[in-house]
Amino acid sequence: NWISEKAQLNLGFTYGDRFFNDRLGMLLSASYQNAPYGSYDTEFMWEQNEDGKVYVSDYQMRQYFVTRERQSYSAAFDFDINENHKLTFKGIFNNRNDWENRYRTNIKDLDENGKGTVRIQTKAGTPDNRNARLERQRTMDFALGGEHLWGAIGMDWNASYAKATEERPNERYLDFQLKKQEFDMDLSDERQPLATPGTGSTLTLSDKFSLKELTEQQEDIKEEDMKFSANFKASLNNGAKLKFGAKVVRKTKEKEIDFYEYTPKDEDAFM
Protein backbone atom coordinates (compact mmCIF):
# COMPACT_ATOMS: atom_id res chain seq x y z
CA ASN A 1 0.00 0.00 0.00
CA TRP A 2 1.46 3.37 -1.02
CA ILE A 3 0.26 5.10 2.17
CA SER A 4 1.27 2.50 4.79
CA GLU A 5 4.40 1.57 2.76
CA LYS A 6 4.10 -2.00 4.06
CA ALA A 7 3.69 -5.33 2.28
CA GLN A 8 0.74 -7.70 2.61
CA LEU A 9 1.31 -11.25 3.89
CA ASN A 10 -0.82 -14.21 2.77
CA LEU A 11 -0.32 -17.80 3.94
CA GLY A 12 -2.41 -20.90 3.25
CA PHE A 13 -2.35 -24.62 4.08
CA THR A 14 -4.56 -27.52 3.00
CA TYR A 15 -4.18 -31.24 3.69
CA GLY A 16 -6.52 -34.12 2.97
CA ASP A 17 -6.30 -37.92 2.99
CA ARG A 18 -8.14 -41.13 3.83
CA PHE A 19 -7.12 -43.73 6.42
CA PHE A 20 -8.06 -47.20 7.70
CA ASN A 21 -8.82 -48.67 4.29
CA ASP A 22 -10.60 -45.46 3.24
CA ARG A 23 -13.06 -45.64 6.11
CA LEU A 24 -11.89 -42.35 7.65
CA GLY A 25 -11.59 -39.20 5.55
CA MET A 26 -9.95 -35.99 6.75
CA LEU A 27 -9.54 -32.49 5.29
CA LEU A 28 -7.68 -29.74 7.16
CA SER A 29 -7.29 -26.14 6.05
CA ALA A 30 -5.76 -22.97 7.49
CA SER A 31 -5.10 -19.47 6.17
CA TYR A 32 -3.56 -16.26 7.50
CA GLN A 33 -3.54 -12.73 6.13
CA ASN A 34 -1.92 -9.56 7.45
CA ALA A 35 -2.74 -6.49 5.38
CA PRO A 36 -1.49 -3.04 6.48
CA TYR A 37 -3.08 -0.34 4.37
CA GLY A 38 -4.26 3.23 4.55
CA SER A 39 -6.17 5.92 2.74
CA TYR A 40 -6.30 9.68 2.40
CA ASP A 41 -9.33 11.59 1.25
CA THR A 42 -10.91 15.03 1.27
CA GLU A 43 -14.62 15.77 1.61
CA PHE A 44 -16.49 19.02 1.02
CA MET A 45 -20.00 20.39 1.50
CA TRP A 46 -21.23 23.21 -0.71
CA GLU A 47 -23.94 25.80 0.01
CA GLN A 48 -25.48 28.75 -1.81
CA ASN A 49 -26.39 32.03 -0.12
CA GLU A 50 -29.35 34.30 -0.89
CA ASP A 51 -27.31 36.21 -3.48
CA GLY A 52 -26.59 33.01 -5.40
CA LYS A 53 -22.95 32.77 -4.33
CA VAL A 54 -21.72 29.19 -4.01
CA TYR A 55 -19.16 28.48 -1.28
CA VAL A 56 -17.70 25.59 0.73
CA SER A 57 -19.39 25.31 4.15
CA ASP A 58 -17.62 22.20 5.41
CA TYR A 59 -14.04 21.16 4.58
CA GLN A 60 -12.60 17.81 5.76
CA MET A 61 -9.26 16.05 5.38
CA ARG A 62 -9.11 12.45 6.58
CA GLN A 63 -6.25 9.99 6.86
CA TYR A 64 -6.67 6.34 7.86
CA PHE A 65 -4.11 3.72 8.86
CA VAL A 66 -5.53 0.20 9.18
CA THR A 67 -3.95 -3.19 9.82
CA ARG A 68 -6.28 -6.09 9.04
CA GLU A 69 -5.42 -9.55 10.31
CA ARG A 70 -7.47 -12.56 9.22
CA GLN A 71 -7.18 -16.14 10.47
CA SER A 72 -9.26 -19.11 9.35
CA TYR A 73 -9.09 -22.76 10.42
CA SER A 74 -11.36 -25.58 9.28
CA ALA A 75 -11.59 -29.35 9.57
CA ALA A 76 -13.88 -31.97 8.05
CA PHE A 77 -14.09 -35.70 8.85
CA ASP A 78 -16.25 -38.56 7.64
CA PHE A 79 -16.17 -42.06 9.13
CA ASP A 80 -17.79 -45.16 7.64
CA ILE A 81 -18.56 -47.39 10.63
CA ASN A 82 -19.92 -50.01 8.27
CA GLU A 83 -22.03 -50.08 5.13
CA ASN A 84 -25.13 -49.08 7.13
CA HIS A 85 -23.75 -46.37 9.41
CA LYS A 86 -21.75 -43.20 8.69
CA LEU A 87 -20.72 -40.19 10.78
CA THR A 88 -19.58 -36.72 9.63
CA PHE A 89 -18.09 -33.72 11.40
CA LYS A 90 -17.31 -30.22 10.12
CA GLY A 91 -15.86 -27.28 11.99
CA ILE A 92 -14.62 -23.81 11.08
CA PHE A 93 -13.22 -20.90 13.10
CA ASN A 94 -12.60 -17.39 11.74
CA ASN A 95 -10.93 -14.49 13.49
CA ARG A 96 -10.59 -10.95 12.10
CA ASN A 97 -8.80 -8.09 13.82
CA ASP A 98 -8.88 -4.53 12.49
CA TRP A 99 -6.59 -1.97 14.12
CA GLU A 100 -7.45 1.53 12.92
CA ASN A 101 -6.09 5.01 13.55
CA ARG A 102 -7.97 7.90 12.01
CA TYR A 103 -6.88 11.52 11.82
CA ARG A 104 -9.35 14.18 10.73
CA THR A 105 -8.97 17.92 10.25
CA ASN A 106 -12.28 19.69 9.73
CA ILE A 107 -13.12 23.33 9.00
CA LYS A 108 -16.74 23.62 10.13
CA ASP A 109 -19.42 26.26 9.69
CA LEU A 110 -17.53 28.12 6.97
CA ASP A 111 -19.30 31.23 5.71
CA GLU A 112 -18.99 32.85 2.29
CA ASN A 113 -16.08 34.96 3.57
CA GLY A 114 -13.99 31.93 4.59
CA LYS A 115 -14.49 32.20 8.36
CA GLY A 116 -15.01 29.01 10.34
CA THR A 117 -14.03 26.73 13.23
CA VAL A 118 -11.13 24.27 12.99
CA ARG A 119 -11.69 20.83 14.52
CA ILE A 120 -8.88 18.26 14.84
CA GLN A 121 -9.94 14.75 15.83
CA THR A 122 -8.20 11.42 16.38
CA LYS A 123 -9.82 8.00 16.63
CA ALA A 124 -7.72 5.43 18.49
CA GLY A 125 -7.57 2.99 21.41
CA THR A 126 -5.41 1.96 24.36
CA PRO A 127 -1.78 0.78 24.54
CA ASP A 128 -3.07 -2.79 24.95
CA ASN A 129 -4.64 -2.46 21.48
CA ARG A 130 -1.58 -0.93 19.77
CA ASN A 131 -2.98 2.54 20.55
CA ALA A 132 -5.52 1.89 17.80
CA ARG A 133 -9.25 1.31 17.61
CA LEU A 134 -9.68 -2.47 17.60
CA GLU A 135 -12.60 -4.24 15.97
CA ARG A 136 -12.47 -8.00 16.56
CA GLN A 137 -14.93 -10.32 14.85
CA ARG A 138 -15.00 -14.06 15.51
CA THR A 139 -17.21 -16.78 14.09
CA MET A 140 -17.27 -20.51 14.74
CA ASP A 141 -19.49 -23.22 13.34
CA PHE A 142 -19.51 -26.92 14.25
CA ALA A 143 -21.75 -29.62 12.81
CA LEU A 144 -22.04 -33.33 13.65
CA GLY A 145 -24.22 -35.63 11.60
CA GLY A 146 -24.92 -39.23 10.76
CA GLU A 147 -26.68 -41.61 8.37
CA HIS A 148 -28.01 -44.95 9.61
CA LEU A 149 -29.95 -47.90 8.22
CA TRP A 150 -31.69 -50.52 10.37
CA GLY A 151 -33.34 -52.96 8.01
CA ALA A 152 -36.28 -51.15 6.42
CA ILE A 153 -35.82 -47.99 8.54
CA GLY A 154 -33.38 -45.26 7.56
CA MET A 155 -32.37 -42.20 9.53
CA ASP A 156 -30.22 -39.11 9.07
CA TRP A 157 -29.56 -36.50 11.72
CA ASN A 158 -27.58 -33.29 12.17
CA ALA A 159 -26.63 -31.21 15.19
CA SER A 160 -24.92 -27.83 14.81
CA TYR A 161 -23.70 -24.97 16.94
CA ALA A 162 -22.67 -21.54 15.63
CA LYS A 163 -21.42 -18.48 17.47
CA ALA A 164 -20.49 -15.00 16.26
CA THR A 165 -19.01 -12.19 18.36
CA GLU A 166 -17.88 -8.63 17.74
CA GLU A 167 -15.80 -6.62 20.19
CA ARG A 168 -14.85 -2.95 20.08
CA PRO A 169 -12.96 -2.28 23.30
CA ASN A 170 -11.82 1.19 24.38
CA GLU A 171 -12.83 3.03 21.20
CA ARG A 172 -11.68 6.57 21.92
CA TYR A 173 -12.30 9.92 20.22
CA LEU A 174 -10.27 13.01 21.08
CA ASP A 175 -11.45 16.29 19.56
CA PHE A 176 -9.93 19.79 19.74
CA GLN A 177 -11.32 23.02 18.30
CA LEU A 178 -10.22 26.57 17.49
CA LYS A 179 -12.89 29.14 16.61
CA LYS A 180 -12.86 32.31 14.48
CA GLN A 181 -10.29 31.22 11.92
CA GLU A 182 -10.04 32.81 8.47
CA PHE A 183 -9.13 31.07 5.21
CA ASP A 184 -8.50 32.06 1.64
CA MET A 185 -10.59 29.68 -0.49
CA ASP A 186 -9.38 28.75 -3.96
CA LEU A 187 -12.41 27.29 -5.76
CA SER A 188 -10.88 27.11 -9.24
CA ASP A 189 -10.93 23.30 -8.97
CA GLU A 190 -14.42 22.36 -7.78
CA ARG A 191 -13.39 18.76 -7.13
CA GLN A 192 -10.45 19.81 -4.95
CA PRO A 193 -10.96 23.24 -3.32
CA LEU A 194 -7.93 24.60 -1.48
CA ALA A 195 -8.16 26.32 1.91
CA THR A 196 -5.14 28.42 2.92
CA PRO A 197 -5.02 29.83 6.48
CA GLY A 198 -5.04 33.61 6.61
CA THR A 199 -2.80 35.75 8.80
CA GLY A 200 -3.08 34.64 12.43
CA SER A 201 -5.07 31.50 11.54
CA THR A 202 -3.87 27.90 11.52
CA LEU A 203 -4.73 24.28 10.71
CA THR A 204 -1.97 22.93 12.98
CA LEU A 205 -2.74 21.76 16.52
CA SER A 206 -1.25 24.07 19.15
CA ASP A 207 -1.91 25.39 22.64
CA LYS A 208 -4.41 27.82 21.12
CA PHE A 209 -6.89 24.96 20.70
CA SER A 210 -9.38 23.96 23.38
CA LEU A 211 -10.73 20.51 24.18
CA LYS A 212 -14.04 19.84 22.45
CA GLU A 213 -14.68 16.30 23.66
CA LEU A 214 -13.04 13.11 24.90
CA THR A 215 -15.18 9.97 24.70
CA GLU A 216 -14.74 6.23 25.09
CA GLN A 217 -17.05 3.42 24.04
CA GLN A 218 -17.12 -0.32 24.69
CA GLU A 219 -19.25 -2.47 22.41
CA ASP A 220 -19.87 -6.22 22.63
CA ILE A 221 -22.18 -8.26 20.42
CA LYS A 222 -22.77 -12.00 20.76
CA GLU A 223 -25.03 -14.24 18.69
CA GLU A 224 -25.55 -18.00 19.12
CA ASP A 225 -27.42 -20.46 16.93
CA MET A 226 -28.17 -24.10 17.86
CA LYS A 227 -29.96 -26.56 15.61
CA PHE A 228 -30.90 -30.22 15.68
CA SER A 229 -32.80 -32.17 13.05
CA ALA A 230 -33.67 -35.83 12.52
CA ASN A 231 -35.36 -37.45 9.52
CA PHE A 232 -36.73 -40.98 9.24
CA LYS A 233 -37.98 -43.03 6.33
CA ALA A 234 -39.44 -46.52 6.37
CA SER A 235 -40.47 -48.95 3.64
CA LEU A 236 -43.88 -50.54 4.29
CA ASN A 237 -44.98 -54.03 3.26
CA ASN A 238 -47.30 -52.74 0.50
CA GLY A 239 -44.42 -50.90 -1.22
CA ALA A 240 -45.31 -47.49 0.17
CA LYS A 241 -42.80 -45.29 1.99
CA LEU A 242 -43.29 -43.33 5.19
CA LYS A 243 -41.21 -40.21 5.89
CA PHE A 244 -41.25 -38.01 8.97
CA GLY A 245 -38.85 -35.84 10.94
CA ALA A 246 -38.36 -33.03 13.42
CA LYS A 247 -36.23 -29.91 13.75
CA VAL A 248 -35.40 -27.72 16.73
CA VAL A 249 -33.80 -24.25 16.43
CA ARG A 250 -32.67 -21.91 19.18
CA LYS A 251 -31.19 -18.44 18.51
CA THR A 252 -30.01 -15.76 20.90
CA LYS A 253 -28.43 -12.33 20.37
CA GLU A 254 -27.01 -9.92 22.93
CA LYS A 255 -25.64 -6.41 22.43
CA GLU A 256 -24.08 -4.25 25.12
CA ILE A 257 -22.75 -0.71 24.68
CA ASP A 258 -21.07 1.37 27.38
CA PHE A 259 -20.39 5.01 26.54
CA TYR A 260 -18.35 7.47 28.59
CA GLU A 261 -17.58 11.15 28.12
CA TYR A 262 -14.74 12.69 30.10
CA THR A 263 -14.18 16.29 31.19
CA PRO A 264 -10.79 17.16 32.73
CA LYS A 265 -10.83 18.98 36.06
CA ASP A 266 -7.91 21.12 34.91
CA GLU A 267 -8.05 21.63 31.14
CA ASP A 268 -4.82 23.65 31.08
CA ALA A 269 -2.91 20.80 32.71
CA PHE A 270 -4.61 18.30 30.38
CA MET A 271 -3.58 20.25 27.29
Summary of predicted features, one role per range:
Residues 1, 26-30, 89-91, 157-159, ...:
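Membrane-embedded beta-strand positions of outer-membrane beta-barrel proteins
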Residues 1, 32-36, 93-97, 150, ...:
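Transmembrane beta-strands of outer-membrane beta-barrel pores
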Residues 3-109, 127, 137-144:
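Transmembrane beta-barrel wall of Gram-negative outer-membrane proteins
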Residues 22-26, 83-87, 151-157, 238-242:
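Outer-envelope beta-barrel architecture signal
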Residues 38-46, 87-114, 125, 156-158, ...:
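Outer-membrane beta-barrel and related beta-rich outer-membrane complex signature
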Residues 55-61, 122-130, 209-217, 269:
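Extracytoplasmic loops and strand-loop junctions of Gram-negative outer membrane beta-barrel proteins
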Residues 183-213, 264-271:
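Flexible glycine-rich, low-complexity coil/linker segments exposed to the extracellular/periplasmic environment
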